[in-house]
C-alpha cells in the first residue's frame, strides 16, 4: 500500500480504541485529499483512489489469470466481490449482506478450503501433459534452435532466428500451439532417444521405426546470415507412420493456412516463404479454428522417407548439389569435429562434452552473441509467474559461457563474442549506458509483452516476449568487458 496507511485496532481495550479512532477521524482524516475507508477494526487513509477491486484487476492482468478465487470478511472486500465475473469464485466469510456468490461462517474453514485448492492445483500441475523440461533435446544450426520431445515431436522452434516468432510452440501452449510430430500409427509410448555421437543430430527409436532429426549445418550455414534454414527429419524402418504437421505462425496469433502442392506443403501468406518437402506423402487438411493441420500416413517398407522443412524458400524441388544424406553426414561432422578438439576432464568427460555441445548450440554464429536459452517463459517454479524470455545475449552470462568453453580448449567462441561485445560498446551512447542484455545482433531488446493466447508451460503464466531487464541498471555488466 505505497499510497495509504492502515490503522488497525483489534485486540485493543475499547476505551483506548475509541480514543485513538476519535483522534484519527478528527485529525488526519479531515485533511484535504485524504480518502477514508472503514472496515472491521481498521481505518485506511489513502491519498489516491484505490480499492481491492483495483488490485484484483491489476493482478489479473499481470499474471494472465483466467479465473480468480477470493475470500473476504470485511466491508472493504465488497469492492473486490463486485469486480469478479465469469468463472471467478467469491466467498464471503461471516455474516452480513454481501455481493459474494458463496458464504462460509467459520474463518478456520478458509484455511481448509485453500489447502484443498492448493493440493488440487499441485496435482494438476504434476499431472499436466507437460513433458519435463530436462527430457527435451536441443537442435541447432547456430541461428535457429529447436526442442524435440522424447516422442520425436518438434515442440519448440522460432525462425528466422532464435529470438524470432515461434513456428511451433506446443512447449508453452499444448498441441493447439503448434507441433511437428512423427510417430508409429500404432501407439508405442516407450521410444528410446539419443544423440548420434558427439553431435546435435538426434535419433528417436521405436522397435520398428527410427527418426533422425537435425538442423542442417552443411555449407557453412552456422555463420551465414539468418533467413534460410532447413530442418531435416529422416524416417527409417517398416510399418505405418503417422505425420502431423501443425505449424502456428507467431505463437499461434496469426491464422495458419496450408496449401497442398506437388511434393509437399506450403504455409500460405507468410512474410518469409516456408515449405515442407515430403515426397510421396498424401495429406489431409484438418480445420482447427483459424488454423489448418496436415496429417499424413505412410507405410514404410525399408526405404527411408526424408522430410525437409525449408524456411526462406518456396522451392519443393529435390536438392541436387547436397542431398539430405550428405547434409546429414556433414552436419554430424560439423559437431563431432568441434567436440573432438575439446580438452575434456578425466572425470565425467562425456557429460562435460555434452554440456559443451549445448553451449556451442546456443552460440549465434553470424555475430558471436551467445543466448542464455533457446526458449522463453519456462518457469522458475511450476505454476509461478517468474517466466522470462531468455533468448537474448546477457553480457555477464555470455561471458561465463565463453569462459567455460575456453577452459575446455575452444577459443573461437570467446573471440567471436568479444567482437560482438566490442560492436555493442561502439554503438553505445556512453560506456555507463550499457544495457545488461542485447539481441544476438547486438541491438536493443524490444519492450516486454505478454502472449495471452498461450497457457504457459504446465499452466505457468504469463508467457512473455522481450525482457524488461533491458532497462535495469546492473553494475556487474562491466565485469565481462573489463
Name each model-derived stretch.
Residues 1-48:
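HAD-like small-molecule phosphatases
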Residues 2, 65-67, 87, 238, ...:
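A general structural motif
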Residues 5-6, 42-45, 98-99, 109-112, ...:
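A short acidic, often aromatic-flanked loop/helix-cap motif at beta-alpha or helix-coil junctions
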Residues 11-12, 75, 97, 161, ...:
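Short, glycine/serine-rich, charged loops/turns that create anion-binding
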Residues 30-31, 85, 365:
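Short, well-ordered coil/turn elements that cap or connect secondary structure elements
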Residues 53-125:
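Mg2+-dependent phosphoryl-transfer enzymes with acidic/Ser/Thr/Gly-rich catalytic loops
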Residues 125-482:
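Acidic, mature catalytic/reactive cores of soluble proteins
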Amino acid at each position: 500500500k505505497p499510497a495509504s496507511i492502515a490503522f488497525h485496532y483489534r485486540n485493543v481495550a475499547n476505551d483506548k480504541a475509541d480514543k485513538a479512532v476519535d483522534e484519527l477521524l478528527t485529525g488526519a482524516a479531515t485533511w484535504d485529499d485524504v480518502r477514508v475507508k472503514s472496515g472491521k477494526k481498521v481505518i485506511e487513509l489513502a491519498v489516491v483512489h484505490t480499492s481491492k477491486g483495483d488490485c484484483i484487476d491489476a493482478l489479473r492482468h499481470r499474471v494472465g489469470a483466467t479465473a480468480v478465487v477470493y475470500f473476504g470478511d470485511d466491508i472493504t472486500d465488497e469492492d473486490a466481490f463486485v469486480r469478479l465475473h465469469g468463472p471467478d469464485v467469491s466467498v464471503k466469510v461471516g455474516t452480513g449482506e454481501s455481493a459474494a456468490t458463496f458464504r462460509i461462517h467459520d474463518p478456520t474453514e478458509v484455511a481448509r478450503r485453500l489447502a484443498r485448492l492448493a493440493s488440487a492445483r499441485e496435482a494438476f500441475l504434476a499431472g499436466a501433459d507437460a513433458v519435463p523440461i530436462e527430457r527435451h533435446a536441443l537442435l541447432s544450426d547456430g541461428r535457429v534452435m529447436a526442442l524435440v520431445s522424447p516422442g520425436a515431436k518438434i515442440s519448440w522452434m522460432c525462425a528466422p532466428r532464435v529470438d524470432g516468432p515461434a513456428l511451433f510452440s506446443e512447449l508453452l501452449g499444448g498441441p493447439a500451439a503448434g507441433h511437428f510430430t512423427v510417430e508409429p500409427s500404432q501407439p508405442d509410448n516407450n521410444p528410446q532417444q539419443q544423440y548420434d555421437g558427439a553431435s546435435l543430430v538426434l535419433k528417436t527409436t521405436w522397435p520398428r521405426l527410427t527418426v533422425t532429426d537435425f538442423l542442417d549445418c552443411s555449407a557453412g550455414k552456422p555463420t551465414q546470415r539468418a533467413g534460410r534454414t532447413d530442418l531435416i527429419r529422416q524416417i527409417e524402418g517398416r510399418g505405418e507412420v503417422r505425420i502431423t504437421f501443425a505449424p502456428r505462425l507467431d505463437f499461434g496469433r496469426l491464422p495458419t493456412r496450408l496449401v497442398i502442392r506437388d511434393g509437399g506443403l506450403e504455409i500460405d501468406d507468410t512474410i518469409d516463404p516456408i515449405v515442407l518437402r515430403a515426397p510421396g506423402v498424401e495429406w489431409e487438411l484438418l480445420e482447427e479454428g483459424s488454423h489448418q493441420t496436415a496429417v499424413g500416413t505412410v507405410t514404410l517398407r525399408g526405404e527411408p522417407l526424408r522430410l525437409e522443412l525449408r524456411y526462406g524458400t518456396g522451392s519443393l524441388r529435390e536438392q541436387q548439389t547436397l542431398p539430405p544424406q550428405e547434409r546429414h553426414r556433414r552436419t554430424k561432422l560439423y559437431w563431432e569435429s568441434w567436440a573432438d578438439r575439446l580438452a575434456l576432464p578425466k572425470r565425467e568427460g562425456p557429460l562435460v562434452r555434452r554440456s559443451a555441445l549445448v553451449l556451442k548450440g546456443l552460440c549465434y554464429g553470424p555475430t558471436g552473441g551467445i543466448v542464455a536459452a533457446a526458449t522463453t517463459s519456462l518457469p522458475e517454479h511450476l505454476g509461478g509467474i517468474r517466466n522470462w524470455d531468455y533468448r537474448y545475449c546477457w553480457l555477464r552470462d555470455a561471458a561465463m559461457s565463453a569462459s567455460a568453453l575456453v577452459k575446455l580448449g575452444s577459443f573461437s567462441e570467446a573471440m567471436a563474442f568479444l567482437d560482438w561485445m566490442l560492436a555493442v560498446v561502439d554503438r553505445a551512447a556512453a560506456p555507463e549506458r550499457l544495457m545488461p542484455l542485447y539481441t544476438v545482433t547486438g541491438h536493443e531488446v524490444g519492450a516486454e509483452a505478454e502472449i495471452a493466447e498461450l497457457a504457459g508451460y504446465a499452466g505457468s503464466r504469463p508467457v512473455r516476449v522481450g525482457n524488461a531487464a533491458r532497462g535495469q541498471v546492473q553494475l556487474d555488466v562491466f565485469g565481462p568487458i573489463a
